[in-house]
Amino acid sequence: MQQLQNVIETAFERRADITPANVDTVTREAINHVIDLLDTGALRVAEKIDGQWVTHQWLKKAVLLSFRINDNQVMEGAETRYYDKVPMKFAGYDEARFQREGFRVVPPATVRKGAFIARNTVLMPSYVNIGAFVDEGTMVDTWATVGSCAQIGKNVHLSGGVGIGGVLEPLQANPTIIEDNCFVGARSEVVEGVIVEEGSVISMGVFIGQSTRIYDRETGEIHYGRVPAGSVVVSGNLPSKDGSYSLYCAVIVKKVDAKTRGKVGINELLRTID
């Protein structure tokens, strides 16, 4: 694996000079091998090690390099044709392979090669970009987007129109992460490498980036870039120091544990915020 990483790191340093016409065989094979490993879930751009999320920057570099070594090509899709550098994940799938891998794909859901989809996942008409990891039992609902290299945990529900930010455009240092057993409400956006920790509930229409203030009304604490585990979050505003205006924030209205979540439905958690 170290040899593979060395090839990627070396190629990335000269990425501006690499084209589909001049890329050498060793570099091309290394990049394609990494994309295959990401595609099967054997490698992840980010993973939790000893309780901390670690981003493997060299894998992200391989994803970026894949755009340098491939020309656009015509792709067939139902009644539509596409023209892009990255092939579709399911282009070569037959019924037996879909059954073996154990997830559902509702047309016209789109997944790029290099994204991993785990068993018992349901993809409604949605979009999953290259390098993303979607773990078991997750629902990606209609018009939701899982950005490049984003990490989605087990038993997550991404509601209709949710946007989970990627790392490629604009270039971000770390991927956005939604941990296990989270619910993200319709039309919410979580971007710029924000981590939503396990068991959190994000209400409809909440927007969280690295600069968004995440206000805990019980403690008065303000978080940036991280939603603490078990948080129930709604959109809100905080006043300026002189009270002349207010600015958007996300508000943690309560904390819940796994036992409470098991007894109370998501809608009930969001309704009883007082």
From Swiss-Prot:
Keywords: Acyltransferase, Amino-acid biosynthesis, Cytoplasm, Diaminopimelate biosynthesis, Lysine biosynthesis, Repeat, Transferase. One of its GO terms (cellular component) is cytoplasm. HAMAP family: DapD. GO terms for molecular function: 2,3,4,5-tetrahydropyridine-2,6-dicarboxylate N-succinyltransferase activity; nucleotidyltransferase activity. This is 2,3,4,5-tetrahydropyridine-2,6-dicarboxylate N-succinyltransferase. Homotrimer. Its EC number is 2.3.1.117. It catalyses: (S)-2,3,4,5-tetrahydrodipicolinate + succinyl-CoA + H2O = (S)-2-succinylamino-6-oxoheptanedioate + CoA. The keyword Cytoplasm applies. PROSITE patterns: HEXAPEP_TRANSFERASES. CDD domains: LbH_THP_succinylT. PANTHER family: 2,3,4,5-TETRAHYDROPYRIDINE-2,6-DICARBOXYLATE N-SUCCINYLTRANSFERASE (PTHR19136:SF52), MOLYBDENUM COFACTOR GUANYLYLTRANSFERASE (PTHR19136). Belongs to the transferase hexapeptide repeat family. Pathway: Amino-acid biosynthesis; L-lysine biosynthesis via DAP pathway; LL-2,6-diaminopimelate from (S)-tetrahydrodipicolinate (succinylase route): step 1/3. It is an enzyme of class 2 (transferase). It is found in: Cytoplasm. Substrate binds at residues 104, 141. GO terms for biological process: diaminopimelate biosynthetic process; lysine biosynthetic process via diaminopimelate.
